[in-house]
């Protein structure tokens, strides 16, 4: 479920040495499955473990995961990186904002998953987002842009050169294109 690099495991062991005996780490997602999802790691003393929690054993400690967070931590990875600028603990959880869908899920569910997990994190840097409104009978994904994308002069390039190209590569034979359903009235919220 969660991968923790050797360097991150060593970092956690060092931190846990200074805690009460049998303290582990808790890995969690606040607001899982939403655009506001945030992942975290905290100390987890023995009396804070709930019966429904799951344990993932590592060298010298366990990662405790609550049942609400578990599906959103699939494929999560924790690493500890050190360089000349210092050191940093990173937690990447690609499914935190949206639960990973099965390969046999509908085309619309799989496209929406790609939009939420791969496309929207990039658009969020400019305050933008995109959602799927429908897939037409001839395989065209109709997309609704919002936030900073609404009124942005670069939306056509983003759609054709970025999003459509990515979706056609991921769903060959299922999708034939992508179109914008958004009314693009320029306003103060627009990125460009």
UniProtKB/Swiss-Prot annotation:
SUPFAM superfamilies linked: Fe-S cluster assembly (FSCA) domain-like, HesB-like domain
Molecular function, one GO term: 4 iron, 4 sulfur cluster binding
One family name in Pfam for this protein: NifU
Cofactor note: Binds 1 [4Fe-4S] cluster per subunit. The cluster is presumably bound at the interface of two monomers.
Key word Electron transport present: no
TM helices/strands, residue ranges: none
Role: Involved in iron-sulfur cluster biogenesis. Binds a 4Fe-4S cluster, can transfer this cluster to apoproteins, and thereby intervenes in the maturation of Fe/S proteins. Could also act as a scaffold/chaperone for damaged Fe/S proteins.
Protein family: Belongs to the NfuA family.
Subunit structure, as described in the record: Homodimer.
Protein name per Swiss-Prot or TrEMBL: Fe/S biogenesis protein NfuA
Organism name: Tolumonas auensis (strain DSM 9187 / NBRC 110442 / TA 4)
Encoding gene per record: nfuA
């Amino acid at each position: 479920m969660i991968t923790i690099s050797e360097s991150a495991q060593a970092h956690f062991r060092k931190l846990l040495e200074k805690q009460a005996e049998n303290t582990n780490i808790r890995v969690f997602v606040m607001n899982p499955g939403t655009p506001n999802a945030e992942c975290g790691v905290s100390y987890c003393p023995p009396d804070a473990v709930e019966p429904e929690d799951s344990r993932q054993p590592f060298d010298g400690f366990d990662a405790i995961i609550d049942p609400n967070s578990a599906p959103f931590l699939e494929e999560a990875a924790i690493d500890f990186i050190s360089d000349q600028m210092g050191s940093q603990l990173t937690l990447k959880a690609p499914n935190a904002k949206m639960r990973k869908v099965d390969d046999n899920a509908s085309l619309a569910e799989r496209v929406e998953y790609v939009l939420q997990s791969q496309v929207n994190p990039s658009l969020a840097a400019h305050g933008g987002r995109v959602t799927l409104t429908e897939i037409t009978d001839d395989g065209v994904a109709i997309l609704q842009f919002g936030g900073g994308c609404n009124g942005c002069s670069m939306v056509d390039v983003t759609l054709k050169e970025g999003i459509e190209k990515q979706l056609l590569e991921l769903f060959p034979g299922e999708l034939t294109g992508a179109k914008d359903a958004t009314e693009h009235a320029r306003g103060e919220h627009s990125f460009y």
